[in-house]
């Protein structure tokens, strides 16, 4: 990790804290998830949910969305100023599923946002606890990353749909703060920036006046976030060019797309955190676990251990495979949508299959789906081993930038090679190396050409038994070097639509 003196760890970002030592960080992250758990228990009481209904992931998601909506200041203000038919700006709600006479029923509930905010604050010692809200946003984002493809969004901004491995966090709301920025992939940042530049091209007032000044500050901040994700000097220098541009236009869009492509091999550092559904924290708190006293980390053994002892259920549609539904949620819980399937399978202890082979749709149930035929089953969220989360991107030391298969952004710090189809990636780099960024482009292409798919990343890093609390005995798995593991291969998932 570069310059640890200036960077805050992501738990500090998550909890909005200044620099803290490890124990303080564990305590404040514990306080955060404990607050989520207390809130969830209180909501289950309010809604009179049975134990089984409270463990239903669809109910958890509805409750999470309600609290996020209750605290969405900007949208609340907008709704009050632009009243739309049938939307009460002061209320929030969603579907709650109840078990009645051996069948699942859907009930639409409506609550005052004020009431939800009161319950949330009460569960969080009277504070707004924005960190907890961000945590829920990241869990929803990780679930979207595992469930949907963003091909359309990529194509719309002029990027290649094969760059899907760069799109972590692409559905995170803007208000997700520093913790949200840490988990966004290179492609996500590039896409946000391209959208901004395009607006500037089409609307000549976008960069002007008082508003334009604020826009400009936001633009430069996003550029700096993206620059911080790159690990080579040439990529960072190109980001400086993009940031300092007087009047961002097509040249900047070109540069950004070039950088996004380069990140397929010279990978950016993107944080991965295990954010679990609220009901999981609720179950632990209800069983008497004191998160703040025990401490908690999003990147160590804790989430694995929590999932080992939690029973969560999900509604299952008639022709869905419960094991596949479990895989989807497992990947979301570990933020592993862009991880190599060989690594995920090894850690999970059961084969993790590419999304194109999953017989399951998303976790959420649309309001027009027939409840008569709905069944429910237990989600298998346990793992055989555990591994440390990484944010390095897995670049090997010799060039601080190594091979990345067209679809991997490593989640776990586990030794493996990162296979990639060099021909496919390099084909995108023909042509334009002139202009003011020519020397940087040449340098980036040179580094990419020298990357080898067989290079080993995370040298010596292994997985650990779940009983190995202090991570003393790494088990280094050996993988078939030729066999790459892209989750998005042969993909037929549905698009993400807001």
UniProtKB/Swiss-Prot annotation:
GO terms for molecular function: RNA binding; structural molecule activity. Residues 1-21 are annotated as: Disordered. Pfam families: Flu_NP. A motif (Bipartite nuclear localization signal) lies at residues 198-216. GO terms for cellular component: helical viral capsid; host cell; host cell nucleus; ribonucleoprotein complex; viral nucleocapsid. It is found in: Virion; Host nucleus. A motif (Unconventional nuclear localization signal) lies at residues 1-18. Its main location: virion. Disulfide bonds: none annotated. Keywords: Capsid protein, Helical capsid protein, Host nucleus, Host-virus interaction, Ribonucleoprotein, RNA-binding, Viral nucleoprotein, Viral penetration into host nucleus, Virion, Virus entry into host cell. GO terms for biological process: symbiont entry into host cell; viral penetration into host nucleus. Late in virus-infected cells, may be cleaved from a 56-kDa protein to a 53-kDa protein by a cellular caspase. This cleavage might be a marker for the onset of apoptosis in infected cells or have a specific function in virus host interaction. The keyword RNA-binding applies. SUPFAM superfamilies: flu NP-like. Belongs to the influenza viruses nucleoprotein family. Homomultimerizes to form the nucleocapsid. May bind host exportin-1/XPO1. Binds to viral genomic RNA. Protein-RNA contacts are mediated by a combination of electrostatic interactions between positively charged residues and the phosphate backbone and planar interactions between aromatic side chains and bases. Encapsidates the negative strand viral RNA, protecting it from nucleases. The encapsidated genomic RNA is termed the ribonucleoprotein (RNP) and serves as template for transcription and replication. The RNP needs to be localized in the host nucleus to start an infectious cycle, but is too large to diffuse through the nuclear pore complex. NP comprises at least 2 nuclear localization signals that are responsible for the active RNP import into the nucleus through cellular importin alpha/beta pathway. This is Nucleoprotein. It comes from Influenza A virus (strain A/Duck/Hong Kong/7/1975 H3N2).
